[in-house]
Every structure is written in structure tokens, then in C-alpha cells.
């Protein structure tokens, strides 16, 4: 939002300097982004060329004698094609800095002729890009005076960075209101427009929107006859130029001026070019309009237009049509002031790719109560600058604004901000901002003004009081220090999430972040696809469903790496999956995928390429080891964990497993992927993966503490004994491990399987499972008798649990 200092002072009575105004704007939340102060133009003066002779040594140069108003002519060498006797322009003396060329002038010698200054073009003064000739001013321009003063370039331009929730400050008047409320001056009030009206406006307006009346809640129209449309006055042209707008003609400039002055976008139609009455309606499919930017737009029923009997004349709230635009031949003009639905304006603007000052304001919300007064003010300016006779205003559809009231306890200011603001000051601030305030003491009833659609509740009112009172008045204070140990900062779920990440990274896996949205087919393949998990507005057709599992995204990521030459990858993710649309149906899961030879010691491990090209393909045991690593890192009691053969349908039925804690708690699953799953996802293997449900893990029995438990070490040497048991093929190795561990849980610290053998010598349907048992004495060195007794218990436990016998 741009405006000039003098423009602001049309609305604000203040003696504050430019620096004070900019500082206060930033303090009250209207951040000043840039200040363009043309004070550097002061040295440029208005001068007249009193003679122009051909340069003796150059065909394209002329030697000018220039009257700068000082009484003594100055010689200047100039190459501008329009340099001539009698021309009045802007002169720069030696020592003047010329911003357009970045040079400080000095007395020069050009092809043997001395030059003591420069006649400047608009580009050299950075007024425009025009450098075809030097500035050509009217003959009555006062010689010797500052060109900046004459051209209005002495007026600093302030640009503020508006947040979307402040539509009231898309006008100079709204900005002045905020400054006045902060104590920097007094807000000026303009008397209501007063002018004579004659007759009715013959062009009628019909709102043809059916049940979608919200698309155009109000429409006001007035005819002004007998106008003379020429250039707008210099003061208006200067202000529009200063903020980057191009003056066109008086009628158009008035609408642009009021857009910034009052935040009220308007539009003018040449009445002679409008066929019959106007209708506000949805555009028809494929309907076209040639807009004022000379571009043709193809419309759809999603767009709201203003049309006459022959077609579209304007894209409502965004841009008018070229056909009914006003030019120097316009004598009768229709002035329109309307209200438009912000959401529809935003969608139409994005769809058509049109950015205008009107769209900028309507999509944020304009003051509905200023629709008719804005038209009155525009009419007043048209009559003042263009003459003519105004007809009566015709208002259609507007039912008035229903003000909102907010119950406001004054103590909320202190509770939410820490500021001590008295009730009287809070009331004063709100009233200066235009709020209606009733009541006294602690509780107030505040009525929100029509120009503040962003105010919705108490917190918004607190913000208003805080920013006007001054954010810099908040006293910095350290947090209270209590001589006690801080409570637990992270939840158990957060701690376990961190532990899972570290454990998997330690195993050489790389963390990935995949989309939470996946194709519907992939979701159904992994147990999802429920209607409540479909996205209402997906960002892409293949991102339609919330994921029920991390594995589809990880498998796709692994395949993308393989397609680019990185086939041996090991990646993991710890994130959320979704079984329903309730908070309880969102799960925290640690999942991972290994591809190719990316086992723990394979090529997928970042710090070891020892077996590159000859590594063993990943299998179910790699995935199982990863899953166990997560469980151990999260503190799950592994002695109670059970592994069952078989997993979900997306795993290979004979090369997968399910991890349980008791009969009901499922901790996760792992395995190699089913060939049908890989085909459906269009990925190639070998691939193995796992998922661990972190939120299914039971809470630790011991209370969380920052203190690590004491490390208990035995002074006695650990002893390892090997056993080989012959069992039926259907017996799981885990059953043998559990049975051996149960022989003496105090002395036996680890049981590991190191060999499985099947052969004819063992008999039909039999196999040999070899285990290594680690025995750790605690209180004393064990005797041979102790080892023999423990060995007997191990053999007996395995025989009882599995029917296994020691292999001879």
C-alpha cells in the first residue's frame, strides 16, 4: 500500500515529521517497507533555452544558452532531439547528483566546447523510462524555482507492508485513523457530499444470481449527464503517478484515486456504449470479454459479471471491459459502486490470472456501509472536475450491515499480553479506532465497525489495544526461577520417537520424509481407502487418500533411487499413519525398507562398501533385526515379546512375521514383500521392510527420570556354551531360545541361534538348531557341578517345551 505524505495529511492533522510518522506506523503494526523521499531533486531548477546553435564539431549536438533565473545565462552542450530555443525544462548545475545516470555533474568539455550543466530527461530524474528527449514544460513554468516543487516530486512516498487481515488500511483514510488513535495527530472528517440531483437513473440493475445472493450483496448505480472528460487535475495526476499508477483521464482517475483514498473500488461505464439495462449474473460457459488491459478472457459460470443486453461489460469486482470504457468522447457516465463476495473474487482472479487494485481490496473485504457514500463522493468529484448533472442513485440488493458485538473483559489485555492498561485507556483506544463501547469498569460490550471484518473475538480486541498502546511498552522479564528439578519435558511417545530414529540411523539407514497422501489404489492395498480418509481437495489426482501405512511411500522412494542408479538403499521414516478421521485413529509408526544388498553389512551401509557387488540380497531377517532394534531402543521388555509366523497381506506369507506382546498387543510386522504387492506398486526387488507401532508399546513401569540407572558389572568372566537340538521342522527357533533362557534368568544373559541344519541323517521332517548360551556368574565363580546342573536344566526345558533332544 503506497501513499504520499501530503495525501496522508489530507486526512490527518499533524505536525509530526516523516521519520516520526514512519516509526509510529511500524509500532502500531503497519510495517513501513520503503520510503521514497525525493529530497534529492531539490537542486534541479526550471530553466528556459534562450538560444540553440549547432555544435561546431558534432552533427548531433547543440550548444544551448540557458536562463536559470539567476540573471546570467549558462552554456550547456545537449544532444536531445527536442532541444530548441524557447523550450522550458529541468536544469542541473555542476555539483548536482543525477540519479538516473548515477553521476555527480562537473564542468565538462564536449568535443571542444565547455558545458556547465545539463538539461535533463525524465529517465535521468527517474520519473519514467522516457529518454527520447529532455523534459518539456509549459511556457509559464516559473524560472529558477525548484523543479521538484513545481512537479510535486517533493512529496515523499511511503509504502507499508499490509497483512491480509487489515482491509481497513488499504485506504489512506484508514491509515490516518490508526495514526490518530495512537496519538499522532487528529483524524480529519470530510463533510458529506452535497449536490443537486435531477431525474432518475434510466439504466436499471437486476441481480440474477438465484440463491447465490452472497456473490453480490449490494449494487449502487448513478448516471451523470453532460460531463466533459479530459485530463485530471495536476494534484490528482501527481499522487497517482507517485504511487505507480498511470493517469488516463479524469473519470478513470477519480475511481483509481478513491480506491486508494477511501478503499472503495468503483467503475465507470460510458452510458452511450451500454445497451439497455445491466444484469449481475454468472458468466456463461465459454463467454468472452475484452478487458481494459486489452486482453481477452474466456469466462465460466464460476465468474460473476456485469452484462448488458449484448454481452459482458465487466468482470465484477476485478476489471471492466474495453467496450464500455470511458474516453475523451464520453458525455454521459454510469458510476458503479458494488459489494462482491471475497472468496469468489479471489478464485476468479487466480483462475483468470488478473491482479488489480480492486481485486486486492474486494478479496480482503471492503466496508459495506461505504458502498453508497463512496458513490456519492465519486459523484461529487465528477461534478467538480468534469461538470454535468447527476441523476438519483439506484441501490439494489443491499439489506444493511448487521454489526457484531463482543463481550470484552478488560482484564484480558493483561492476561494475554502482560500489559497494564487501564479500563479508561482501553475504552479510549477502541473508540478512536471506531469501535462502539458500552459499559464501564471490568466488562465492556464492544460493537465492531463495518470496516473491520477481521475482528471476531476478545483476542482481536486485545491485539487492537496492545498495538495502539505500544508493543514496546511490554516490559522484558526473566522467567521465574524455581529451585526444583524440572518436570519431564518430553512425553513417552516423543522420547520413543527420538530413540527409534537414532536406533535405525545407527543401523546405517537414512531417514526419509514421504507424503502423507497416496493414491487410492495404494491405500486399499495396505488396508486403507476408507471414505473418511479421502481428501476433499487433493493437490494431485495421485494423492487422494491419507496413508494407512508408511510402506507405500518408502517403497516408491526406494524405487526412485533405484531408477537413478542407487539400487542398494536402506531408508526409514518415523511418522503418522491413519486408520480413521479421529485423533485416536492416527498412529505413530517407525517403518523402514531395505533394497538390493543393503543389509546391515551390505553396500547400503554408508561407511562400508566392503562387499560391494557381491553382497547377499536383503531378506526377512534383515527386516526382523531392524524391528528388534527399534523395540530394544524403546525399552520394550524383549523377554516377553513373541514372534509369530506370517504378517499382513502385503508381505510374503512364508517370509514374514508379526511381533506381539501378549495375545492382544500387536507391536508390528516385518518381512519380504509379496510379489503381487511389488507389481501393484510398480517396484522391483529384492525388498524387505518392517513397521513398529510406537504408540502400542506399553508405558514403562519405572517412572521416567533424567538419572541413568547404575551400570551393574560382574567381576567374573562370562562363559559361553553351545547346544544343538534336533526338533521337528515346524518348531520355531524362538521357542528353543525362550526355553533355554528360562532355565535360569539370573545367570543366562543371552541366547543366540547360530546354525540351522536339515539333512537325511536327522530323519524325515527333522532339523537341527544350534544355539549359543551366554552364562554370566554374578556372586561367585561357578564350579563344574554348577555348570552341569545348569546344562541339565537347559536341556530339560527345551525338551519339555519343544520336544527337542541334544544332537549326538
Curated annotation (Swiss-Prot):
Record domain FDX-ACB: where: 714-807
Binding site for Mg(2+): 454, 460, 463-464
Class of this enzyme: ligase
Main location: cytoplasm
Entry note: cofactor: Binds 2 magnesium ions per tetramer.
Family under the similarity heading: Belongs to the phenylalanyl-tRNA synthetase beta subunit family. Type 1 subfamily.
Quaternary data: Tetramer of two alpha and two beta subunits.
Name this polypeptide is given: Phenylalanine--tRNA ligase beta subunit
Originating species: Rhizobium meliloti (strain 1021)
